Amino acid sequence: MAQRYDRAVTIYSPDGHLLQVEYAQEAVRRGSTVMGLRTNNAIVIGVEKRSVGDLQEERMVRKICMLDDHVVMTFSGLTADARILVSRAQMEAQSHRLNFEKPTTVEYITRYIAQLKQNYTQSNGRRPFGLSCLVGGFDEDGTPHLFQTDPSGIFYEWRANTTGRSSQPVRDYMEKHADEILTIADEAAAIKHIVRTLVSVSSLNHTQMEVAVLKYRQPLRMIDHQVLADLERTVRREIEDEAEASRRPRAP
């Protein structure tokens, strides 16, 4: 039945679905896990790092991109599609600076990306972008924002969110610890929370993750692998201690 309605992106299935858009969302679900967290003064991004061949240049395999000096984006899904979106968004940000002599807001550039994605769900001869993006940054007054866009073109603002292959268990974990996330005030606690989530839920080690921090009017900072290694040891020890404590018989 599906094959009758997935030949073109503009054809609805009988139950009201655009199957090409759903296929694009499946590409996202098969992509690397990425997550973002917004504090009062920082945007912290954590991504699953794919293994790189011994002869491959590691700098060419990046999932964290700057759209402007104050906006960072990461994604899950098709890297080639992301390259096009990043290039278009960067040009839009530069054009906005030239025309209005001030940087874009984070919502403006997110809305531009979402509109571009949505346009590709209504045109023949095209296919939807097969990626979901997390866009974080600061407005001119220093207000931090974190948005997510989907292949369909919708976007929402979040305090913390994730996308990719482990997005559901990671989101469940974050919702379980929502009170803790809402009280995170500094970047150190945010970095530790992201490392703990990737270690405990996605079963990653420090060599399989990248973490970046963006602060107001400061350049993007990649967290050193030695720092990630130390944090991994700390959170693994905490997880073991919590598991041991839960196994102890409770006092009557």
From Swiss-Prot:
Can the keyword Flavoprotein be found in this entry's annotation?
no
> Which GO BP terms apply?
proteasome-mediated ubiquitin-dependent protein catabolic process
GO annotation, cellular component aspect: cytoplasm; nucleus; proteasome core complex, alpha-subunit complex
Tissue expression summary: Testis specific.
Question: Which keywords does UniProt give here?
Answer: Cytoplasm, Nucleus, Proteasome
Q: Name one Pfam family in it.
A: Proteasome
S-S pairs: none
Q: According to its UniProt record, where is this protein located?
A: Cytoplasm; Nucleus
Quaternary organization: The 26S proteasome consists of a 20S proteasome core and two 19S regulatory subunits. The 20S proteasome core is composed of 28 subunits that are arranged in four stacked rings, resulting in a barrel-shaped structure. The two end rings are each formed by seven alpha subunits, and the two central rings are each formed by seven beta subunits. The catalytic chamber with the active sites is on the inside of the barrel.
| Family note | Belongs to the peptidase T1A family.
Q: What does this protein do?
A: The proteasome is a multicatalytic proteinase complex which is characterized by its ability to cleave peptides with Arg, Phe, Tyr, Leu, and Glu adjacent to the leaving group at neutral or slightly basic pH. The proteasome has an ATP-dependent proteolytic activity.
What protein does this entry describe? Proteasome subunit alpha type-7-1B
Task: Say which species the protein is native to.
Answer: Drosophila melanogaster (Fruit fly)
Q: What is the lineage of its organism?
A: Eukaryota, Metazoa, Ecdysozoa, Arthropoda, Hexapoda
